[in-house]
Amino acid sequence: MVAKALAQLITCIILFCHVVASVEDLTIRQVTADNRRIRPNLLGTHTESKFRLFMSDYGKNYSTREEYIHRLGIFAKNVLKAAEHQMMDPSAVHGVTQFSDLTEEEFKRMYTGVADVGGSRGGTVGAEAPMVEVDGLPEDFDWREKGGVTEVKNQGACGSCWAFSTTGAAEGAHFVSTGKLLSLSEQQLVDCDQACDPKDKKACDNGCGGGLMTNAYEYLMEAGGLEEERSYPYTGKRGHCKFDPEKVAVRVLNFTTIPLDENQIAANLVRHGPLAVGLNAVFMQTYIGGVSCPLICSKRNVNHGVLLVGYGSKGFSILRLSNKPYWIIKNSWGKKWGENGYYKLCRGHDICGINSMVSAVATQVSS
């Protein structure tokens, strides 16, 4: 144990020295918008030319010179943040993303959205899922390969991740019970759901202002279910509630919270379908690809709702000097982010709080 800890410390020191010594010309791979080419991103040199390249790749425009200068300054800071993330998380690739002109506060407000519940599991109290047999689970598992996951969606500049996590779980549960995959309406939740956590009346579902997946389940049980995406399409902003009970496609029967145990999470995933989860998205702002296995990532600052769709058995972690199993996570920032819209995160030790807010839902077909 001492030798392993010493080896990890030496590795960290080497990585830190490398970053500090070469910050002016450190190269981080940047996947461009088409996800087919890779360009070098020279940190600290020719910052403005790199900023213009970023603007071109991601279709960014600024209305005034003042705004341009402001965003350029933020971009320069985020390039350095990407270098720091690369050092802390070398088994993944970090660099310039579509969020590189946003402050951390702007990023959290516009692109995350799980309500702050003070580090607790949060949300309406559902029954805790019964313990599930974990022996015999497959080494690797992916609901995408079985046809149980819809295409990656895009929440836009709206803190509605909680709605996408909720619909993803309902879509998966419906697929497990019927064999049919439907794309369900996030906009119904954004417009109509105002359910609150009974333990914290400030933690209410509030459209683009954030919410909780368990609150959303409670709303759906009371409202009668979810419409399909095609009948209630997403707009990226809150509007008047247009829910039509006659158009309900899937009804929510109940929901459960999954125990804080990674084997139980994996077993429930395999047996019951994709799971709604919350996590700390701090490393996701600069994430481009690979298995993210950060040395330090707070478990308490859970702020983003995503969908757990599978797991893999072998993702090499440089800092941890071994192969580590990982989760496969569907995000809601479009296909140009991450690995075609997906995130891989190390399993073990509740990294980034991934175990702390996991729930499953049971559905039935609308009659």
Swiss-Prot record:
Set out the biological process GO terms recorded for this chain's protein: proteolysis
Free-text function comment from the UniProt entry: Probable thiol protease.
Note the PANTHER family from the entry.
Answer: CYSTEINE PROTEASE FAMILY C1-RELATED
Which positions make up the signal peptide? 1-22
**CDD domains documented for this protein:** Peptidase_C1A (cd02248)
Q: Name the domain of life this protein comes from.
A: Eukaryota
Disulfide bonds listed in the record:
158-208, 192-241, 297-352
InterPro entries registered for this protein in UniProt = Papain-like_cys_pep_sf, Pept_asp_AS, Pept_cys_AS, Pept_his_AS, Peptidase_C1A, Peptidase_C1A_C, Peptidase_C1A_papain-like, Prot_inhib_I29
Record the organism. Answer: Arabidopsis thaliana
UniProt GO molecular function: cysteine-type peptidase activity
Keywords per UniProt = Disulfide bond, Glycoprotein, Hydrolase, Protease, Signal, Thiol protease, Zymogen
The molecule here is called: Probable cysteine protease RD19D
- What positions belong to the pro-peptide in this record? 23-136
Q: Which family does it belong to?
A: Belongs to the peptidase C1 family.
Enzyme superclass (EC): hydrolase
Query: What's its EC?
Result: 3.4.22.-
Active site positions, chain numbering: 161, 304, 331
Q: Which residues are glycosylated?
A: 61, 254
Any Pfam family hit? Peptidase_C1
